[in-house]
């Protein structure tokens, strides 16, 4: 004889409900383990034009490209008004070699981008003369869209104190 167990509809409904609840709770636990503090929220913010000096000392094309990207985006997000905003990059590190005229072919894409940003008044580029000389360059060896300043650190301080530029690294 075959032993068949029969459950009431009420018992089956309770079992199904418990299984569903257990599945939902388990899924919630898994999600909480992946994001135990929830997800970030976006704060919609409108930015006014800014005065900013970037202290640039990088040694790779990727890092220099990132600096140009950030400065360009800052200009865009703050209104890109050359009369109310000012973004100045002060170069005094390994990136100096990218701006040497003798390296134009090697870094053509980067230089075209930098020159375009200067030409369109998105930003200005200044280079430390002392650092350039340390790399073996004089002003005549550097691309014409770059302005040479006697000392990068002194220029950064001057821009902060005299022209109220915020400091960015």
Which stretches of residues belong to each language-model region?
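Acidic helix-start/capping segments at beta-turn-to-alpha-helix junctions
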Residues: 85-99
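Bacterial N-terminal signal peptides
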Residues: 18-28
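Bacterial N-terminal signal peptides that target proteins for export
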Residues: 6-20
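Solvent-exposed coil/turn segments that connect beta secondary-structure elements
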Residues: 59, 92-95, 130
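N-terminal secretory signal peptides
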Residues: 34-86
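Bacterial Sec-dependent signal peptides at the C-terminal "C-region" and cleavage site
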Residues: 28-34
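A cross-taxonomic marker for long C-terminal extensions/tails that follow the last structured domain
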Residues: 100-169
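Structural recognition of the beta-strand scaffold that forms the well-ordered cores
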Residues: 52-55, 88-91, 124-127
